[in-house]
Amino acid sequence: MKTFSAKPHEVKRDWYVIDATDKVLGRVASEVAHRLRGKHKPEFTPHVDTGDFIIVINAAKLRVTGAKTTDKKYYRHSGYPGGIYETTFGKMQQRFPGRALEKAVKGMLPKGPLGYAMIKKLKVYAEGSHPHEAQQPKALEI
């Protein structure tokens, strides 16, 4: 019997919506990354994007455990000497409510063209509404 290998044009993608209200950041991110990769499907193939589309609503209501609200730091660099910027999880949640989840999920996906294609299937919204009703997303409980 030959090993099955999924073909990119034969992959069936579903849409799921996750309500992140009072959920822990890492637990939501790991489940989202798992589904974006397609590892929950029996036809998972490592070199083919077999994942589903994921919509995360209420990203502003995500929580972290312990003192990570003030202690967890995010860094970025402008490219100029001395141009490093640092912000905390709390400040990032106030300014850009979905960015912490996006960064957490992106770090859990493969690096390279396949990973970049996977992260495009993630849609994060700070509030409880989203513009993807036409896709009829199924609710996914974590």
From Swiss-Prot:
The keyword Chloroplast does not apply. One of its GO terms (molecular function) is mRNA binding. GO terms for cellular component: cytosolic large ribosomal subunit. Pfam families: Ribosomal_L13. GO terms for biological process: negative regulation of translation; translation. InterPro entries: Ribosomal_uL13 (IPR005822), Ribosomal_uL13_bac-type (IPR005823), Ribosomal_uL13_sf (IPR036899). Keywords: Ribonucleoprotein, Ribosomal protein. The keyword Repeat does not apply. Belongs to the universal ribosomal protein uL13 family. This protein is one of the early assembly proteins of the 50S ribosomal subunit, although it is not seen to bind rRNA by itself. It is important during the early stages of 50S assembly. Part of the 50S ribosomal subunit. This is Large ribosomal subunit protein uL13. It comes from Ralstonia pickettii (strain 12J).
